[in-house]
Structures are given as C-alpha cells and as structure tokens.
Swiss-Prot record:
Gene: LRRC9
Region (Disordered) location: 302-321
Start-end of each LRR repeat: 53-78, 97-119, 120-141, 142-164, 166-188, 224-248, 264-287, 344-367, 671-693, 694-715, 716-737, 739-758, 759-784, 786-812, 886-908, 909-930, 931-952, 953-975, 976-1001, 1023-1048, 1092-1115, 1116-1138, 1139-1161, 1201-1224, 1225-1247, 1248-1270, 1272-1292, 1293-1317, 1319-1345, 1365-1388
Highest taxon, organism lineage: Eukaryota
Protein name per its UniProtKB record: Leucine-rich repeat-containing protein 9
Annotated PANTHER family: LEUCINE-RICH REPEAT AND IQ DOMAIN-CONTAINING PROTEIN 1-RELATED, LEUCINE-RICH REPEAT-CONTAINING PROTEIN 9
Gene Ontology cellular component terms for the protein in this record: cytoplasm
Keywords (A to Z) from UniProt: Leucine-rich repeat, Repeat
KW Lipoprotein (keyword) present: no
C-alpha cells in the first residue's frame, strides 16, 4: 500500500516536472533554483514533492481534484499561492508560509475564513466563489490591500474589517448583503479606493436593487476611485452625491422639526387646558389663604392686646397643631379665640381639599403628556430610519381620505369581538393612528420567496397560492411590553431569529393571528396579574387602555393544524410552511356560552420562514371601557370650567362651592380693613401699637396694596414681617432688616430677588404664588444672602426649569430642613449634592463627553455633530488631559448636565463641534477662546440674547431653540461667511434685522416667536441661498392675510415653507396675488425705515405695479405728490384712500376706472363685450338708455379724493370716460388724457372747477350734446391730433382762454367760424388741419376773435388785425365784383362782430398756383392768387417751426 502511494507520488512529481519544463532526474539538483511552479487542468490530485523546491516563491494550481491544502510546510519562501477551481473545503496548512503575500483560493468549497492569523504579510486574498457566510478571521492581516469575497453567502459586514485599515480593493459582489447600514461599516476603511458590490460577472446583491444605492455609497465613501467596475474619480460625481445627501438631510431635518413643533403645540394645548382647569381650584386656594392669613392676624392681635408689641419669638404659623393647642388655653375672650381656631381648622381643610384637586389635575396632565410624547416618539425614529436608508424605508401617516387607512380601520373593527373582552370591562376599540410602513428591503425578500413558491408550482395552482396571502396581527410576547426600540427593529430589519417568540412547548416560529383578542388578551391578563393589588379600577384600565397593533402581510403557504402533543418546530412539520391552532384549542381561551360565532374563525398561526411575514401597518389604538378615562378634555372637566361660573347649582362642584361659602360665612366674620397704598412712620407705629421703633419685632402688612416698603430702616429689631397679598414686584426694601427671621411674601407679583441681601438671620421665607422664573439667579441670591435659612416655600411660581428645581435648591442651600413644606431627608440631600457637583465643567466631564476625531463622520443623520462624534468615539475617564491633549479635543457634548455656566474651555482652541443643550445657561459666556467652532448647539436653556460669537467666523450651524431669546447683538452674523443653518425656534424674537448679510444661509428655523410685521420678511430678501424657512407660530401668520403666498412671493428661491414643500402652483398664485402690488413693506424696504409720516412724495415708476395697498393709510397722510407712471394699474386701487394727494401721475398704465371694474356680465354677447372695451367699434351697442344709465350711476356715486387737483392719465388705452368715473373727482383742476382712445368727451359734468383738459392724440370726431352741457370753468382745452371735423357744442365754455385744435380734420371754414361764440379765447392752434391750406382762415380768425393773442404759435398784434381787416375787406370787394352773390354785402366793420353768411364763390377758374388749395368750389383772379400764395408760403414755414416746438403739455408742479 505504501509502495503504491510512493509510486503514485512519484508519477505526480514527474507530471509536475513535465508541466514546468523540468527534468525529473535532475530535479534534486535544479529544484533549488526553481521559484515558480504551475499546474493546470488535472494531473496533480495532491500537493506533493514541494520539498524538492525549497526556494519556491510562486505556486499556481488550477482546476485540480485537490480536497485539502497540505504539503506546503517546506515552502518557507512562498509569496504567491493559487489553489483555484479545486475542491478545497477548509483553509489549512498555511501556518509555515509566513512570507505569503498573495493567496488565491477562489472557486472552491470553503465555508469559513480561518487559519490565516500568521500570514501577517498577506496583501491579496481572493476567496470568491465559495460558500462563506461570515467575514471573520482577518483581524491580524494588517497589510491586506486586496480582498475578493464575491460569490459567497455573506449577508453582513459588521466590524469584521475594522482592523484591515490598509485595504484598498474590496469585492463583495454576488452575496446576500441587503442593508445600507452594512455598507456604512466600510467608512472605517480609510484607504479603500476600489469597491465592487455589483460586478457583472456575479449575481446582484439585494442592496444594489435599492433606490439611491450609488448615491449612498459615494456619499459615505468619498475616496473611492472605482465603484462597481466604473471610474468614479471625477469631482463632479462626488459633488453630486454630496449635494443629494445634503438635500436629504435638510429635508428630513425639516420634517423632524415639524413633528417636534406639532408635539410642542399639542403639549401647549394640554398645558392651556390644565391652566383652565386649575383656575377654579387656584382661586379657591387664594381665597381661603387670604381669609386664613387675615384670621391669623386677628388672632395675633387678640393675643397681644394690652401689650405694646407681640412676642417676636413665635416664628411658626399659628395654625400649627401645637400653636392651636396652646391658643386654646388662653383665657382672654376664650369664645372668640375658639371661633377663630375653629374657622382656621375649617379653612385648612378646604385648602387641603382644593390642593388635592390641583394635584389630581396635575397627575392627569402628566399622564396625557406622557401619552402624547409616546405617540410622537415613534415618528421621529421612523424618519431617521427613512433618512439612513435614503428613502428605501418609507412611512406614511394615514387619514380618512386614504383607502388603505379605511381598509385597516375596517379590518380591526371586524376582528374585534366585544364578547372576548367583556371580562375586562372593554366595550369597544378606538383607532387613534395608523402608520403605513413600506420597507423596500423586506418587500423584495418577501416577493422573491413568494415568487419561488409560485415557480415551483403548476400554473393552475398559482392562484390558490395567492389566496394564501393574509393580513394578520403579529402576537407580541405578553410578558414584555412593546418597546419602541423592539418595534423599530422589526419594522426595519424584519422578524429575525431573535424575534421569534419563545413560548411554552418551544413553539419556535413567528406567531400571528386573525383575532384581536388572541393578540391582546394575553397582554391584558399579564398586566392584571402583575398589578392585581391595585385598588382603583380606573388605574387598572389605564394599564392596558392604550395599545399597539402590528398588521402584517403573511404568506401561509402549506398550512396544517397543530398536533396536540408535538412542539411546533420546523423539524416536526418539515413539509409545511405554517401551522395553525383554532381558538377552541388554545389553553388561555375563555370558552363559554357565546352569542356570536367569531371563535369559529379565530386562529393562531405559526409561520416558520420569517421572510414571509412582512410588517406593513402600525396601529395605535385605545380601548373604550365602561369606566371613562381621566382626560383633560373630558366632559367632566369642561363642566368644572363652565358650569361652576354660569350655574353653580348644576355644577359638579356645586356642593363643594356651597360648602366653601358656608366656611367663609363662619363666625367670626372679619370686617375688611382699608388697604394701605403707601407706608409712612405714622402708619407703622399705628400698626405696631407702639411709639418706639426699636420695640417693634413683628409687623403684619398682609392684605394691602403696597408695592414699596419705605421707612423700614428704623425697625432694626424687626424679626417677623408679613407682606402677603400685596403688589410687590421686588423685595429690595428689606435688605437692611438684619435681624429679620421670618418673612412671608407670598401672593404677590415678585419677579426677581435682586436687591434681596443682608438677611443672614432669616430662617423662614415664603415666596409662593409669585412670578419668579429664573431659578439660577434666584438660588444664587438666596445662597449668598440667606445663610441661615431653614424653611423655604417657592411653590406656584412659573419657574423655567421646574424638573430640577428642588435638587438645585437643596444642593445650594445646605441649611434647609424643609422645602415647599416637605422635610428634606438625608438621601435627598446627598442626591442633591451629587447633582450640584455635576453642574460644573471639570476635567473629568471633559474626558467623558469629548472626542478628538478630526473629521465629522459621513453619517446620514440630523443630530448635532458633537453628539454623533462623542457616541462614536469618546476619550474615556481613564485618560489624563495634559495641555497638549486639550488642543486635540474637537467635539464636546455636554447635553443635559444641568450646567449654570460654561467654564474651563479656555484651552479648547481647536474645538469644532459643541453642544450644551438642556442645561440652565442664561448667558453665552465662556466660548470666547473657541473661535474655530463650526457647529454650536444651545437648545433648551434660558439664554435671552445672542452675544459673544461674532468672532466665530467658521460657524456653519447654530441652534438655540427653546430659550428666551429676544434678539442678538448688532453685526453678530455679518462675518459668518459659512453659516448655512440657523435654528431659533420657540423664543421671543421680534425682528429679523441683522440677518441681511447672512448670504450663505440655506435653512432658517424661527417658528414660535413674536415676529409680527410684514417688513421683517424684507430682511431675508437678499438671502438667495435660503431654501427652507419655518415661520410657523409667529404673529405674522395671523396678521398677514394670505401669509404663505406673501412669503413665497417675496422669497422666490424658497423650496419649503413651514415644513411644507412649495408647489409650482403656489408660486404662480403668489405672483398673481402679490405681483405688481405696491405695499407699505416695499416702500419701507426701499427707504430703509417705516416712518411714512415724513413722506411727501411717492415716486415708483416702471415697477410693474398692478395694485396699491398702503396700510395703514393714516401713515401716508402727508403724501401730496404721487408718480406711478409706466406700470400696470387698471384702477386707482388703494390710492383713493390717501387723504392729501394733490398731484397724481398715472401715465402709461391700463386705467379702466377709478374703482376696480366688476367682471363682465355673463349674459352679454361677444359683440356687446367688444363694445364695452371699444365703443368706437359700434358692435353690440345697446342704445342711449345704456349710456344714460352709466351717466346716472356715475353721477350718483359719492365723491372721492377731495384733495386731488392734477391728474395724469395719458396713454392708458382709455376709450370710455363714463366708465372712468372721473365725475367723482369734484375738485380736479387739471386733467391730462392724451394718447388714449377716447371718441367722446363725456362724464366730466361734475368737474366744475376743472381749468385745463388735455385730450390730445385721441379719436374724437365731434362733441355730443352732453360734452359741455353745463357752464364750465375750463380755461384750456387741448384737442390736438384727433379726428375733429366739427366744432359745435362749445358754447358753454364761457371762460375758455386756450384752445388747441392742431392736426385734426377740420376742412370747412364754417367750423372755425363757430369759435366766435368763445369770446374769451386768447390762444388758438389749428395748424395741421385741411382748412390751413386755405390761408383765409388766419385772417378770418384774427378778425372774428377780437381777444385772440396767439394763433398757431405766433403772437397776434395790431398789424395782424389791420392786415386781416384789409385783406378780408379787399377779398369781399373783389368777390362782390367778380361773383354774383345771393346775399347783400355787409359793412366791413361788422365782419367779426356780427355773424355773416358763408362766402360763396362760383364759376371762377384758377389756371395754376394756389387755387388748388381752395378746392374746386373757389376760383381767384391771378392777382389775388399771387398775393395769397406768397403769404401762404411764409405761413407754412412759420407753422412748421411752431409745430416742432409744440409738445404735449407737461403736468404743472
């Protein structure tokens, strides 16, 4: 046997030598010179003969039938080993190959990475195409650079590669990796440059099928040069991935902030309701406390009657039991004292009763707050998972409008049977919230396995398999409450092995049910057993009242009923997918006579394959019980509020209120004393019933109206002072009472203890029922100036940090024995000391909460970098911080350390990321040395002003939410050139001034502040990078109508507003609503201030204005000149409300009427609509009655703009003056309407003071009867460049002095003769008319208008008049001699004074020259023609010059 093996080995070595060109006979001599051997495709079944090659460095064995690695012990120099495409099942036999650098074991049957610990020089390791399930055994391979694990069964990465920091190339293609979180583990490989997860040669990893796969990898691994065999070294690719990731982070940060805001709003509603509920008990407590203190004063005075002062040694309240007993022994007026004591006892009982009610309300409030937080607490983690998975995990909160919501709702109701829950007092179920979860990762697994079942079955059975899909409730372990973390793990990762229920009989499977009772009753039973000793039934219901259901999609597959005696496991049911148990066989089933058949259908299933149970819906529900749940919004509590005031007899507290009245009316009934407003010497002595100040040791000023304690400095012996129920806001006046031991300042309005000092002997202090807020400041004052204090009461004050107040006070005031009436135990004092010790920044706290990481980890998270870094890598308390170590600290997270101030950070010069959230900080001090800060978080403190950070020029993120901020220092943000996120939510900020230069700002969260004025938005208009703005909860939302559109219009770059993405339709609506709108905000923005009262002129031309909305109008009362030329106004809009406007210029607009026109009537035809717009068209004209109606309606409208005198409406396209409603401008003096489309002068009858009317360049042909029907004050009328042919209807213009008729179509001289009715006319133009071709018009007009001083731009003098008379007389004479006329000639002197008939000349021929200008009906002699021709030529030259000089009139200013 041995000989055959040796013979076989010899043949193998011969084959080895043959394949590598070596001589078998000489191998003993030549073997030492061989460094490389190769064996391909059979002939080498075992590794043998390598001892012959001691210097071998490379060995390649491919496609051999080798089953194990052996025989390599002699190969001490081996550096490269290939054993590929063999049958190797285990990595072994390599321990001696310590110089190995490259190892190729691909295409084998290896299932585990092992025995590589000693190969520390290994650089390349290929284990692809094996059956490896886990990455392990690589910890010692520090030099590994190339690792190929493709084509295996690996589903997780974990931290197994953390030690391989030199790794440059990694191939994990063809595995079962399905989670993005697994890929983030690769971020700890700093040298990784080539990563392959989706190599085309292998099957696809499930993770590669997810959305945003490439983006996720490239963002987390920015140093990659090649990814999935592609070159990704281009800078643009990395920038795109970074930009996408940044947008995702911003988006989810916005959504999380929106959720937090909604939670805060809900909690504020609860708090408001609590305050309303507490109002009645508080009023009762105050009333009884007042009466009680009044009686105590009476009792003290009664005991001290006959004495000059009361016993100052009695510092305890007289209502203490010991005092009451001692008082009973007093013999002086025993009956009165007994009555007082009896009434005091009754009052104490009532105070206790109402205090108990206050405590009950507080308890219910805390229960509801806890429930609200629990309900909201699931949403934020879901959003974080959604961010981490880059949207592959998505959830949606349902509403009644969603079909899937209604489906789930009906499913729950259909599977609830009241019979099953009757024993627990449950009558129904109320669904509060349904969350739909879409986990793409789990869904792919589910669909993949489901598809395999379908493929393995015949087509005929596929439909039956689909019917095996069910929606079932997951059955949680009843003995373990549903923790948020556990539920989130199921939703994100599915039902893993660790999630299987370990129930009796070792039932190992995912348990689901189609019955609510099967899912829930075990939990209810367990909770009842656990708390069976509780006495209150309502409390028992509260244990299980709220619950969570997880609805899953389940593929039951082949399902059989469970056998009674066999445990439910896959081994007992090998051929099935699930096992079910009907309800009647369940051990905990409560069976009995039932009125329904629900139990027949109720089953519990056990599903073996976890991937076939897909979580889809999370349902939050509440059981409806016979005992109603205590709620701040219950009917009972509302009755407390309303009915107690309106109808005490019906109120639920009616008996208590009656009892209160009876107690108040008990004897003795103390008469009210007159209230003191001020204090003087006489009053003090009178109250103390003594004449010597030094004798006064007790002074009771209870129940007055005092706000100051003057003249108390003389009371040097005062030991006891009661100033309760007064009007004090501070206690400055008691600082000099050095002997004071007892001070009662309750029920006042004290807001600060500043000035409260020097009371070293004070032992009892009552500050309850005041307005103290700043716990840190007030505790400091008490600590410094009340060193002997024993009892302190600070209840019922609006403290800023009430949760830690008690520990803070006890820890600082070490002499205290009682706080708020409760004894301070040693344990509580010790806990308080530890608490105070932790409120200071020490070296130990720096070590525990800091990190030295140089770069922020690339993690998709919205949490502050300081929080992330200190969780990833802390320094640890065991280290010692030297001076150099301080400089290494880059991140510091001191959240929730109850700090009162920031100290000891002077050496942290390189600090980049810091967080001090949820502390007691009141100032931003102690950060002066941290000028390299990039992120600073100060949420949840008591800071009132942003200061001291102007030098932090590298700051990129600043968050100061939930503080008391009212503003910031000037120029705080001017130098922050990298600031892109600013969050100032839930503060008291009133202005955004100071943010104008924050040009890099991308996100601004400033919800729930006090911003009220629209102008504040203009401070953000220059921030072109701002894409997310949250202004929710500010006053501007209610002050500004259409607030959302207002902000969108003014900040067009925004992508999201108030947590809601901006839709394109909203942008369009904003432009329609606010585009071209002149508002006070726009004016304030341009002026830089909003003091509009100083404005006298408003000049806003060429700004696309469509409407004017200047509010408040009273602010613009001094504006007298308005110029809005070249805009898009269609009416006067808001200008009509400006009270003192005198000059209004609206040229080049689209004015249709003074007031906005109503929409056209729908019943009008298209032709009628055309006539409304262009009356000259003649289409659709409705007759005179319509015009008359317009005139009547215009005349009946009330006048407006009483101060307006000058109006410019040129070039507006006006065609109808009646629709313009100019009659309402009764005081108008100058009206300019040039360049329009006016065809009729009408609708101006009421303008009785109008002096100048300009209608040049219009379409006027003639004047109708109503044009100038009434006598007018018009002095100048401009009608140039129209279409006038007639000049009638001007007789009412009795005061007209200037008339401009140039460039019309007047061709009949008889029309000019009609002007002689205007005897006042001084200036006239008619050039450019056809009549001007006949030179007779000038002489005729000069002759007929005796007052004319200017004609066609030329002055008219006496010579012109003489020439006119001469030429006209000569013309008349020649006419009489040449032409027979039908009328007798007139006396030449009467030409121009008396209207004469027109000249008629017939049958006269002009051969040439001038005659053609006069028309065919006039013929002149050659002499007359020669004279008139020369004159006409001169006149043409003159008129051309005048026309060039003549332009349309400008507005008088």
């Amino acid at each position: 046997m041995i000989e055959s093996e040796n013979l076989n080995q010899e043949e193998i070595i011969k084959e080895l030598c043959l394949c590598n060109g070596l001589s078998y006979e000489m191998v003993g001599q030549e073997g030492s010179d061989t460094s490389k051997l190769e064996m391909f495709f059979l002939g080498y079944p075992r590794i043998v003969g390598l001892s012959l090659f001691p210097n071998l460095t490379s060995l390649t064995i491919v496609a051999q039938d080798i089953k194990e690695i052996s025989g390599l012990e002699p190969c001490l120099q081996l550096k490269e080993l290939w054993i590929a495409e063999c049958c190797i099942e285990k990595i072994e036999g390599l321990q001696e190959c310590r110089n190995l650098e490259k190892l190729y074991l691909y295409f084998n049957k290896i299932s585990k990475i092992e025995n590589l610990e000693k190969l520390i020089k290994l650089k390349v390791l290929w284990l692809n195409h094996n059956t490896i399930k886990n990455i392990e055994g690589l910890q010692t391979l520090k030099n590994l650079k190339d690792l190929n694990l493709a084509g295996n069964l690996i589903n997780s990465i974990g931290r197994c590669l953390d030690s391989n920091e030199q790794l440059e190339r990694l191939n994990l293609s063809g595995n079962q990796i399905c989670s993005f979180k697994e890929l983030t583990n690769l971020t700890r490989l700093p040298c990784l440059k080539d990563l392959c997860l989706n190599d085309p040669q292998y099957t696809t990893n499930p993770v590669c099928l997810l959305c945003n796969y490439s983006t996720h990898v490239l963002y987390h691994l920015p140093c990659l040069q090649r990814f999935d065999t592609l070159d990704v070294s281009a800078k643009q690719i990395k920038e795109l991935a970074d930009t996408t990731a940044m947008k995702k982070i911003m988006y989810y940060n916005m959504r999380i902030k929106t959720l937090q805001r909604h939670l805060k709003e809900d909690l504020e509603k609860l708090n408001d309701q609590k305050c309303k509920l507490q109002k009645l008990p508080e009023e009762r407590v105050k009333l009884f406390s007042f009466v009680k203190k009044t009686l105590e004063r009476e009792l003290a005075e009664l005991k001290g009657s006959g004495k000059g002062h009361s016993d100052g040694s009695n510092n305890s309240k007289v209502t203490d039991p010991e005092t009451l007993k001692s008082c009973e022994t007093v013999t002086e007026e025993p009956s009165l004292q007994q009555k007082i004591l009896a009434k005091l006892n009754a009052l104490n009982e009532r105070v206790t009763f109402w205090n108990k009610k206050l405590d009950e309300i507080e308890a219910i409030y805390h229960i509801e707050v806890k429930q609200k937080k629990k309900s909201h607490g699931l949403l934020i983690p879901l959003l974080l998972i959604e961010l981490e998975t880059v949207g592959n995990f998505h959830f949606e909160e349902g509403t009644r409008s969603d079909d899937w919501f209604n489906f789930c709702y009906e499913l729950i109701l259909s599977r609830f049977c009241a019979w099953d829950f009757r024993t627990y007092g449950i009558t129904g179920v109320k669904v509060k919230r349904i969350i739909k979860v879409n986990n793409r990762i789990l869904r792919l697994k589910f669909e993949e396995k489901f598809q395999k079942f379908l493929e393995n079955e015949d087509m005929h059975d596929s439909e039956s398999y689909r019917r095996m899909l069910e929606c079932l409730f997951y059955v949680f372990d009843p003995e373990v409450s549903v923790k948020k973390k556990h539920l989130l793990q199921i939703l994100e990762k599915g039902f893993k092995d660790s999630e299987t229920s370990k129930l009796p009989l070792k039932k190992e499977a995912i348990i689901v049910s189609n019955s609510l009772s099967i899912s829930e009753c075990p939990r209810i039973e367990f909770l009842q057993q656990k708390h069976k000793d509780e006495k209150k039934i309502s409390l028992k219901h509260e244990l299980f009242r709220h619950g969570i259901l997880l609805i899953t999609k389940v593929f039951l597959g082949q399902s059989v009923q469970a056998h009674e005696k066999e445990s439910i496991s896959q081994s007992n049911y090998p051929m099935v997918n699930s096992v079910f148990i009907p309800r009647k066989y369940l051990l905990n089933s409560v069976m009995g006579q039932r009125n329904c058949d629900c139990s027949v259908r109720q089953c519990k299933w056990f599903v073996f394959d976890h991937d076939l149970v897909l979580p889809e819906y999370v349902v939050e529900f509440e059981y409806i019980t016979m005992v109603k749940a205590p709620s701040l919004f219950s009917v009972f509590n509302n009755v407390i509020l309303e009915e107690s005031k309106k109808n005490p007899e019906v109120s639920v507290f009616s008996k208590d209120l009656k009892f209160d009245d009876e107690v108040i009316k008990m004897e003795p009934r103390i008469k009210a004393r007159p209230k003191l407003i001020s204090l003087d010497d006489k009053t003090i002595l009178s109250l103390a019933k003594t004449s010597v100040y030094s004798h006064i040791v007790s002074l009771n000023l209870h129940g007055n109206s005092l706000s100051k304690l003057r003249d108390l400095s003389k009371l040097t012996g005062l030991r006891k002072l009661n100033i309760s129920f007064n009007e004090f806001t501070c206690l400055d006046d008691v600082y000099h009472l050095y002997n004071l031991e007892y001070l009662d300042a309750s029920h006042n309005h004290v807001i600060t203890l500043e000035g409260f000092r020097g009371l070293m002997k004070l032992k009892h202090l009552d500050l309850s029922w005041n307005q103290l807020k700043k716990s840190g400041n007030e505790i400091n004052m008490l600590c410094k100036h009340t060193t002997s204090l024993l009892t302190l009461d600070i209840q019922h004050n609006p403290w800023q940090k009430p949760a830690t107040l008690r520990l803070s006070v006890i820890g600082r005031l070490k002499t205290l024995t009682h706080l708020n009436g409760v004894f301070i135990s040693e344990e509580e004092a010790t806990a308080a000391m530890k608490f105070i010790a932790g409120t200071r920044i020490t070296q130990l706290s720096l070590l525990r909460h800091s990190s030295t990481k140089e770069e922020r980890p690339r993690i998709l998270s919205i949490w502050p970098s300081a929080k992330i870094l200190t969780q990833v890598s802390k320094l640890g308390p065991h280290l010692h911080l030297s001076g150099n170590c301080y400089l290494k600290i880059t991140a510091l997270n001191l959240d929730g350390q109850h700090l009162f101030e920031i100290t000891n950070l002077e050496k942290l010069e390189n600090l980049k990321w810091a967080s001090f959230s949820n502390n007691n900080l009141t100032k931003m001090e102690g950060l002066e040395s941290c000028i390299n800060l990039e992120e600073l978080t100060l949420d949840g403190n008591c800071i009132s002003k942003i200061e001291g950070i102007s030098k932090m020029t590298k700051l990129t993120r600043l968050s100061i939410n939930n503080n008391l901020l009212t503003g910031w220092e000037e120029h705080t943000f001017d130098n922050m050139l990298h600031l892109h996120s600013l969050s100032l939510e839930n503060n008291r900020i009133t202005s955004l001034s100071g943010l104008q230069k924050s040009f890099t700002l991308v996100e601004l969260y400033i919800s729930n502040n006090y911003i009220a004025v629209n102008q504040e938005m203009h401070n953000l208009k220059g921030l072109c990078n701002l894409v997310i703005l949250d202004m929710c909860g500010n006053i501007i939302i209610w002050n500004q109508e259409n607030y959302r559109l207002f902000v969108i219009f003014h900040l067009p770059e925004l992508k999201a507003l108030d947590g809601i993405p901006i839709e394109p339709s909203e942008t369009d609506s904003a432009k329609d609503l606010f585009g071209g709108r002149l508002t006070s905000d726009m004016i304030a923005e341009r002026q830089g201030h909003s003091n509009f009262k100083q404005m006298q002129e408003l000049n806003w031309t060429s700004s696309s204005i469509r409407t004017v909305d200047l509010i408040p109008v009273d602010q613009f009362r001094n504006v007298c000149n308005v110029n809005l030329q070249n805009n898009h106004l269609t009416s006067f809009s808001g200008l009509i409300y400006l009270p003192n406007v005198k000059v209004l210029c609206l040229n080049y607009n689209h004015i249709e009427s003074i007031m906005p026109r109503l929409k056209p009537q729908t019943h009008l035809t298209s032709r009628q609509l055309l006539y409304q717009k262009v009356p000259s068209s003649g289409y659709g004209q409705q007759g005179i009655s319509k015009t008359n109606r317009d005139i009547m309606s215009s005349e009946n409208l009330p006048p407006i703009m009483h101060s307006l005198e000058v109006l410019h409406l040129g070039y507006n396209g006006i065609c109808n003056l009646i629709q313009l409603q100019l009659n309402r401008l009764r005081n108008l003096k100058f009206l300019f309407l040039q360049g329009n489309e006016i065809s009729q002068v009408e609708g101006l009858d009421n303008l009785v003071v109008l002096q100048e009317l300009v209608v040049d360049h219009n379409r006027i042909r003639s004047f109708n009867d109503s044009a100038f029907a009434k006598p007018s004050s018009l002095l100048a009328l401009h009608l140039e460049e129209n279409r006038l042919r007639e000049l009638g209807k001007l007789q009412s213009l009795v005061k007209l002095e200037k008339l401009f008729l140039g460039y019309n179509k007047i061709q009949d001289i008889t029309e000019l003769e009609k002007l002689d009715v205007i005897s006042t006319l001084r200036e006239l133009t008619v050039y450019g008319n056809p009549i001007c071709r006949k030179m007779l018009h000038r002489h005729m007009l000069i002759f007929r208008l005796p007052n004319l001083q200017m004609l066609d731009g030329s002055p008219v003098n006496s010579d012109d008049r003489a020439k006119a008379e001469f030429h006209l007389a000569e013309l008349q004479a020649k006419k009489n001699s040449l032409i027979p006329v039908t009328h007798s000639p007139m006396d030449g002197r009467s030409f121009g004074q008396v209207k004469t008939p027109p000249i008629e000349i017939t049958n006269v021929l002009l051969p040439s020259g001038f005659s053609h200008y006069l028309g065919s009906d006039v013929t002149l002699t050659p002499e007359v023609e020669e004279f008139l021709g020369a004159t006409f030529q001169d006149q043409i030259e003159c008129n051309c010059l005048k026309r060039n000089e003549h332009t349309p009139r400008n507005s008088p200013v």
